[in-house]
Design a protein with these regions (language model features):
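C-terminal ends and interior cores of transmembrane alpha-helices
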Residues: 102-117, 307-324
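Intracellular juxtamembrane helix-capping segments at the cytosolic ends
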Residues: 135-149, 337-349
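Helix-loop boundary and gating motifs at the non-cytosolic
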Residues: 11-78, 234-278
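Hydrophobic core of transmembrane alpha-helices in multi-pass small-molecule transporters
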Residues: 39, 118-138, 244, 323-340
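Helix-to-loop junctions at the C-terminal end of transmembrane segments
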Residues: 79-93, 179, 285-298
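C-terminal membrane-cytosol helix-exit motif in multi-pass small-molecule transporters
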Residues: 202-222
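A membrane-interface helix-boundary motif in multi-pass transporters
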Residues: 179-205
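Glycine-rich segments within core transmembrane alpha-helices of 12-TM secondary carriers
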Residues: 157-179
Length: 349
């Protein structure tokens, strides 16, 4: 399907908004269903990425517990990718996708139900979150590929990126302010763990609604084909080495912010504020780089992102103070979009 252009009326903001809604309605049904699903789940991802770590830090102050949780998460992801290939032969892809979203709420509920945080319970919650990520990402890209074509893919990814940016700005700020205010003002009799449980309910509700929406789609499951390989093209092996570098940096992204901010800077409010400001900076930076760079700049952009991570880590290691954390977070905020912008186009090529 070719992208269609709807001329918007020269009215106010509401007229233009209705014009965009009408334009959205011109796209295929499955594409619209998937976009609405991803829009809802975009408001869940910042919660599970940021505030599970702060919950562990607040209730245990054990850095090893946060690391153990993340190790469990990233152990569960590749295992789920493998088993998902078998399950897709017998289970509808929308059900697997929905199951992945619902498991994120289950993982948080398991964590909140632990009377005393112990490493065993944290690892169980982490493995469940790894299953969630695995089922979610293993099926999301196929659904996007099968629901779009070359003519409307730019619109799809543009709108999806817009949803993700809005969620990355709004959710950390709001959740961080809510949790911080609970601790500072004694809401719920000063029981901040109850506030975390309310956040978990919020996650559950969104995942249930998102699952109901995606199940309305008429998505076809992929053909039964081989999905396990042991020999790869030389170019693919080079890509995997690049992925290792990105994975090392990704470990800092998911682990370091909550530990460092809760230990050296402040509380959930500080973390949420830093992440919201960072999301705005990232959005502007990505737009400018996407607008003014070309394919020949990709390796340089990726390398600049890695260099920023290294510089931020060095500053934090030397200073190990609130100032060092802020410098590290700034480098992380600038380095992450640089790495994504350089890496993903190389991957798709």
């Amino acid at each position: 399907m070719k992208e269609t252009t709807v001329a918007g009326p020269k009215g106010g903001i509401f007229s233009r908004a209705f014009s965009e809604i009408r334009h959205f309605g011109t796209y295929p049904f499955n594409m619209r269903v998937l976009l609405l699903t991803n829009m809802l789940y975009a408001f869940v991802l910042p919660v599970v990425e940021l505030f599970v770590g702060t919950y562990i830090m607040r209730n245990s102050s054990e850095l090893a517990y946060v690391v153990g949780y993340q190790l469990a998460v990233y152990t569960g992801i590749p295992l789920t990718f493998f088993f998902n290939g078998f399950l897709m032969r017998h289970v509808r892809i929308t059900h697997l996708y929905s199951f992945g979203m619902l498991l994120s709420g289950v993982s948080m509920a398991v964590m909140m139900s632990l009377e005393t945080l112990a490493l065993g319970g944290i690892i169980v919650a982490g493995l469940i979150m790894g299953l969630s990520y695995g089922f979610f990402w293993a099926n999301r890209d196929f659904l996007a590929l099968s629901s779009t074509d070359d003519g409307n893919r730019n619109y799809y990814y543009g709108l999806e990126s817009f949803f993700n940016t809005v969620a990355s700005v709004v959710v950390p700020g709001m959740i961080g302010a809510f949790l911080g205010a609970t601790a500072d003002h004694g809401w719920f009799a000063g029981n901040i763990n109850f506030a975390y449980k309310l956040v978990t309910v919020f996650v559950f509700v969104l995942t249930i609604v998102a699952s109901a929406v995606v199940c309305r789609g008429r998505f076809a499951s992929p053909a039964r084909e081989r999905f396990v390989y042991f020999r790869f093209d030389r170019l693919w092996n080079k890509m995997m080495r690049l992925a290792v570098l990105k994975g090392i940096a990704q470990g800092y992204i998911v682990t370091a912010p909550s530990m460092l901010v809760m230990t050296l800077v402040g509380n959930e409010t500080t973390l949420g504020t830093l992440q919201s400001i960072g999301a705005l900076v990232s959005a502007v930076l990505l737009y400018l780089l996407g607008r003014f760079t070309s394919s020949r700049h990709r390796v340089a952009i990726f390398s600049a992102g890695l260099l920023l991570f290294a510089l931020g880590g060095a500053f934090n290691a030397v200073l190990y103070s609130a100032t060092g954390v802020i410098v590290f977070m700034l480098c992380l905020v600038l380095g992450r979009p640089l790495m994504d912008l350089g890496y993903f186009p190389i991957q798709l090529r």
